[in-house]
A protein has these predicted regions:
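Feature captures the catalytic ectodomains and active-site-proximal regions of enzymes
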Residues: 1-185
Length: 185
């Protein structure tokens, strides 16, 4: 799923983003990222932009849960375009031929602005690091000024190599760090 997901994110970037303002970033499994960077200080989104996480509406019709508010037209257009692109994508056709479910479209939710966080070391006088396979937690770690330690075999799922994560944490804490956060799901 990660490989196909990355391919589909790249497909979206190539076919749907006609400006430098939009940037898709592949993540782990369904956890991908779409960034909008305003070049003129104005964004199409505001506090009234409303999106719904897909896991909150399982087994429901999506019509009443599509993005609403400022910028919703842009988000809905991307979602509709993804449906068209994914239907024709060879990787999805191979999944269907193998009796597997295809990726049918992107579902955009969880919008917000990156917070401006004071570095943890500056605020509390201690240095830290994080070990995680989850991009959201990596991002929070970076915003806090922590080292983000990449561990081979860390997947963000139950098949994670916990032993390797533990060894990496012990090695890291043996250095200059005051603490380490190891994310286990």
């Amino acid at each position: 799923p990660n490989e196909l997901g990355a391919e589909l994110v790249q497909l979206m970037q190539k076919n749907c983003c006609g400006s430098d303002n939009w940037k898709f970033h592949p993540g782990v499994s369904y956890r991908n990222l779409l960034l909008y960077r305003s070049r003129d200080g104005k964004a199409p989104f505001a506090d009234d932009t409303y999106t719904v996480p897909p896991h909150d509406i399982t087994d429901q019709e999506i019509a009443g849960h599509l993005p609403m508010g400022s910028g919703a037209c842009d988000l809905r257009a991307l979602m509709t375009k993804s449906e068209e692109l994914f239907a024709e994508y060879p990787g999805n056709q191979a999944r269907i031929a193998a009796g597997q479910l295809p990726a049918t479209q992107i579902w955009l939710w969880g919008q917000g602005k990156a917070p401006n966080l004071e570095p943890f070391l500056q605020k509390y006088g201690v240095s830290g690091a994080v070990i995680t396979a989850v991009d959201l937690l990596r991002g929070i770690g970076k915003l806090l000024g922590w080292n983000v330690i990449e561990v081979p075999g860390a997947t963000g799922y139950i098949d994670t190599d916990y032993r390797t994560k533990g060894r990496a944490a012990i090695e890291a804490i043996s250095g200059d760090l005051d603490f380490i956060v190891v994310h286990v799901e």
